[in-house]
Amino acid sequence: MAMEQLLELLQDNAQLTPAQLAVMVGKEEGEVKKAIARYEKEGVIKGYHALINWERTESQKAAALIELRVTPKKDTGFDEIAGRIMNFSEVESVYLMSGGFDLAVTVVGRTMQDIAMFVAKRLSTIDGVLSTATHFVLTKFKDGGVVFNS
């Protein structure tokens, strides 16, 4: 079975049933179920989630991309700092980057003020964090491959 094709279909729409996926990839439903179970066990498939357009609800949220310059640790490099950052509930993603900063962190909070306080009191105080630059999301046009229409 073409692993890439099955994974791309699931990435685009995780609600497809194994029966639907089997038709789309030209395989038996049982083969597809086994492949999905194997991908989940091996950590290829890391999870399933709903992509919410919070602007269409009564409880809007604020989001930000935060650039961090950090000093890597001698034995663990960037992994230790990234690991500490990942554990905050406000953090949605952490990326090691090339270019003018080291880590890119996406954060969600109830308000911009909540995010600002998170950066000031929790993120910037981590040992090894040299500087932060916070960029608030003003409008989300596309996320996770899905177009958001206002």
Question: Across the structure, where does each feature detected by a protein language model lie?
Answer:
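A compositional/biophysical signature of low hydrophobicity enriched in polar/charged and small residues
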Residues: 1-150
